[in-house]
C-alpha cells in the first residue's frame, strides 16, 4: 500500500518564477534530443546499412532494420511507467537527471561501432536500447517536473512547448539525419553527445525536487508481463511480414502464431495482475477520472493512426517520388527530410497556440478539432496520385501537422491537470505508455498493411516490367517473386535492387538501352508505384478511422477538469475546479472538496495527503487533510 508525503521544498516568489523557466528549458532540451533520436535513423538507414555492410536484399536482415528503429521505442513504452513511479518515490528530478546521463553515455557508445554485418546490426540495437532507457527516464518525469513547477493557469503553455519540442524533434531528426549521414553515418549518433553533456550538467546544477513523495513497491510481475507481452507481439509482427515457405508473408508460421498468441496472453495476464496487486504498474483507479481516461484513449488512437505516417512518407518520397523526379538515390534522404518540413511547420504553428488557448477554454474543442482535421487529411491523401504535384502534398502535410498541434498540447495538459500531485509521475508514465506503445504498434501495423497491399500486385507488375525490357521470361518469373518486404525496404533505403537481382550475366546479354533502364534510378520506382499505391490506400484508410475514433474519445472527455488540489483557497482569485468532467466557477475553501459522483481526490491549497490505494484516492470519495 502506498503512502504520500507532501513536505514541499519548492521555491517561492521570484525564485519560483526563475526555476519554472529553467525547468521548462531543460526538460524541453531533453525531450527534443530523445525525439530527434527516434527519427534521425529513419532517414540515415541507407548510409548506416552501407556503412556496416548489411545487405537489404536478404529478407532476414529486415529484422535488424526494424529493430534498430523499434528497440528504442519499445524500451520507452515498457519502462516509462516504472520510471515515473520511481520519480514519485525517489524524486522526479533525481530520476530525470540520471536519465540525461544514461542517454548521453549510450549516444557516445553508438558512434564507436567497429563491426560489420549482422554483428554491427546487433550492436546498434543493443546500444539503442540503452539509449532508450535513458530517454525513458526523461520522458517519464519531464511532464511531472513541469506540472510541479508551473501554476495551473500556465501549465498548458509549458506542457505545450514541451510537447511541441517532442513532436517537432521527430521531423527535425529527419533533416539532421539527411545532412549528417552522407558525411559519416556515425555522426547521427555523436551529434547528441555535446547537447547531452550540457543538459546533464545543467540539470544537476539547476533542477530540484518539489518534495512530494509516494512510498510504494515496484510491481515486478506487472512490469515483466507487460514487457514480455509487448515484445512478443512486436517480434511476431516482425517475422509475420517476412516470407515463409512459398508464402510472401509469414502469418501462418508456427513461430509467428506462437509469439503472437503468447504475447496477447501475457498482456491479458498483465491486466489481471494489475487489478490484484497492492502497488500496480498501472494504477487502474486513475482511469475512474474521466478526463484522464478519455485523454489517454484519444492519445492512444491518435498515435496508432499517425505513428507510422512518417515512415510511409519517407518511403514514398525516398523510394518513389524523388527518384521519379530526377533525384539520385544518394541525395534522396536529405531531400525527403526537407520535403516533409511543411508538417513540422504546421505543428509548430498550432501546438503552442492551442496549448495557451486550452488553458482558458479547455482541451475538448481543440483536441477534437485536431483529430477531425487529421481524419480529413488522411482522406485527402487517398486522392493524391502516386506521382503527385508537390503543392497539394505540402498543403495536406502542413494541415496534418496543424491538426496534431491542435490535439497534442491541450490533450497532454488535460491529462496532467486531472491527476493528484503525488500521482503525476505515475500518471505521466501511464500516459507515455499509451502513446509509445501505440507508436510502436502503429509502425508494425502500417508496415503490415503496406506489405499486404504490395503483395497482391507486385509479382505480375515486376514480371511485365522485366519482360518489356527483354529480360528472358524464366528470369523475369524468378525475379518477380521478390519478397514484398524486400521491395518495401529497398524503397525505404532508396535502393534499386535490379542490377543485383539480375546479375551481370543477364544484363550483358540485354540491349544496351534495356540494361541502362534496368539499372537506372527510375525503373524500380516506376514499377513499385502501382503496388505501393495499393498499400498506401489501405494504410491511409486505417489512419483515417483511427483518428476519427480519437476525435470521438476527445468529445467524451467532458468539460475542463482540474484536480481539486489545484484550487485556490478562499480569498484568493477564483479558481476553476472540475470534478468528473463537470465544471464549476466556485472557489473551493481550504479543507473542502467538491462532491461529485466520482469524487475529487485532494483538497484546496497544497497537495493531497491520501494513500492512493485507499478511499479518498482518485477513485474514492472526498480526501481528508
Question: Residue locations for each model-derived region?
Answer:
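Transmembrane-helix exit segments and adjacent C-terminal regions of multi-pass membrane proteins
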Residues: 1-35, 291, 359, 371, ...
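Transmembrane core module of solute transporters
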Residues: 24-36, 40-73, 254-258, 266, ...
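Interfacial helix-cap and linker-helix signal at transmembrane-aqueous boundaries
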Residues: 48-49, 86-87, 176-182, 237, ...
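Hydrophobic residues within membrane-embedded alpha-helical segments of Major Facilitator Superfamily
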Residues: 26, 33, 102, 109, ...
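C-terminal module of multi-pass small-molecule transporters
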Residues: 79, 91-100, 107-110, 114-123, ...
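Hydrophobic transmembrane-helix bundles of small-molecule transporters
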Residues: 182-297, 305, 616-625
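Transmembrane-helix bundle of Major Facilitator Superfamily
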Residues: 2-204, 354, 381-382, 393
Amino acid at each position: 500500500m502506498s503512502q504520500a508525503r507532501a513536505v514541499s521544498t519548492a521555491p517561492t516568489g521570484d525564485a519560483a518564477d526563475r526555476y519554472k523557466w529553467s525547468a521548462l528549458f531543460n526538460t524541453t532540451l531533453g525531450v527534443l534530443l530523445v525525439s530527434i533520436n527516434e527519427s534521425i535513423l529513419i532517414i540515415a538507414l541507407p548510409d548506416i546499412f552501407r556503412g556496416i555492410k548489411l545487405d537489404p536484399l536478404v529478407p532476414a536482415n529486415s529484422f535488424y532494420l526494424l529493430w534498430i528503429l523499434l528497440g528504442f521505442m519499445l524500451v520507452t513504452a515498457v519502462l516509462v511507467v516504472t520510471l515515473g513511479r520511481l520519480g514519485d518515490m525517489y524524486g522526479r528530478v533525481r530520476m530525470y537527471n540520471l536519465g540525461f546521463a544514461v542517454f548521453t553515455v549510450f549516444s557516445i557508445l553508438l558512434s564507436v561501432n567497429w563491426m560489420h554485418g549482422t554483428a554491427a546490426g546487433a550492436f546498434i540495437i543493443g546500444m539503442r536500447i540503452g539509449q532508450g532507457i535513458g530517454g525513458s527516464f526523461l520522458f517519464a518525469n519531464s511532464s511531472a517536473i513541469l506540472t510541479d513547477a508551473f501554476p495551473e493557469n500556465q501549465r498548458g503553455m509549458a506542457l505545450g512547448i514541451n510537447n511541441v519540442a517532442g513532436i517537432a524533434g521527430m521531423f527535425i531528426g529527419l533533416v539532421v539525419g539527411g545532412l549528417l549521414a552522407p558525411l559519416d553515418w556515425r555522426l547521427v549518433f555523436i551529434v547528441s553527445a555535446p547537447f547531452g553533456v550540457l543538459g546533464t550538467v545543467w540539470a544537476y546544477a539547476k533542477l530540484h525536487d518539489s518534495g512530494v513523495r509516494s512510498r510504494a513497491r515496484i510491481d515486478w510481475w506487472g512490469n515483466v508481463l507487460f514487457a514480455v507481452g509487448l515484445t512478443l507481439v512486436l517480434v511476431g509482427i516482425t517475422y509475420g511480414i517476412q516470407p515463409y515457405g512459398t508464402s510472401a508473408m509469414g502469418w501462418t508460421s508456427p513461430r509467428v502464431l506462437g509469439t503472437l498468441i503468447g504475447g496477447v496472453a501475457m498482456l491479458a495476464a498483465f491486466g489481471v495482475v494489475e487489478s490484484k496487486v497492492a502497488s500496480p504498474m498501472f494504477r487502474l483507479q486513475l482511469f475512474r477520472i474521466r478526463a484522464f481516461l478519455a485523454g489517454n484513449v484519444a492519445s492512444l488512437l491518435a498515435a496508432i493512426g499517425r505513428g507510422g505516417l512518417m515512415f510511409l512518407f519517407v518511403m514514398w518520397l525516398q523510394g518513389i517520388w524523388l527518384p521519379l523526379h530526377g533525384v539520385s538515390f544518394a541525395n534522396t534522404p536529405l531531400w525527403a527530410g526537407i520535403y516533409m518540413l511543411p508538417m513540422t511547420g504546421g505543428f509548430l504553428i498550432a501546438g503552442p497556440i492551442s496549448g495557451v488557448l486550452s488553458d482558458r477554454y479547455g482541451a475538448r474543442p481543440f483536441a477534437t478539432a485536431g483529430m477531425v482535421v487529421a481524419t480529413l487529411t488522411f482522406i485527402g491523401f487517398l486522392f493524391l496520385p502516386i506521382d503527385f504535384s508537390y503543392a497539394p502534398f505540402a498543403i495536406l502535410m502542413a494541415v496534418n501537422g496543424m491538426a496534431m498541434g491542435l490535439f497534442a498540447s491541450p490533450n497532454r495538459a488535460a491529462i496532467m491537470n486531472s491527476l493528484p500531485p503525488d500521482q503525476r509521475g505515475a500518471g505521466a508514465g501511464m500516459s507515455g505508455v499509451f502513446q509509445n506503445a501505440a507508436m510502436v504498434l502503429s509502425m508494425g501495423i502500417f508496415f503490415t498493411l503496406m506489405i499486404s497491399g504490395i503483395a497482391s500486385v507486385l509479382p505480375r507488375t515486376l514480371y511485365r516490367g522485366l519482360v518489356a525490357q527483354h529480360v528472358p521470361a524464366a528470369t523475369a518469373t524468378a525475379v518477380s517473386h521478390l519478397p514484398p518486404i524486400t521491395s518495401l525496404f529497398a524503397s525505404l533505403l532508396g535502393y534499386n535492387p535490379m542490377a543485383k537481382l539480375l546479375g551481370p550475366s543477364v544484363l550483358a546479354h540485354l540491349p544496351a538501352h534495356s540494361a541502362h533502364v534496368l539499372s537506372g534510378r527510375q525503373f524500380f520506382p516506376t514499377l513499385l508505384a502501382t503496388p505501393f499505391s495499393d498499400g498506401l490506400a489501405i494504410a491511409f484508410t486505417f489512419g483515417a478511422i483511427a483518428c476519427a475514433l480519437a476525435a470521438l474519445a476527445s468529445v467524451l472527455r467532458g468539460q475542463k477538469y482540474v484536480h481539486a488540489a489545484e484550487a485556490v483557497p478562499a480569498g484568493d482569485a477564483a479558481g476553476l475546479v472540475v470534478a468528473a468532467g463537470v465544471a464549476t466557477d466556485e472557489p473551493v475553501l481550504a479543507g473542502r472538496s467538491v462532491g461529485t459522483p466520482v469524487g475529487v481526490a485532494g483538497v484546496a491549497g497544497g497537495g493531497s495527503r491520501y494513500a492512493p490505494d485507499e478511499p479518498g484516492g482518485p477513485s474514492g470519495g472526498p480526501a481528508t487533510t
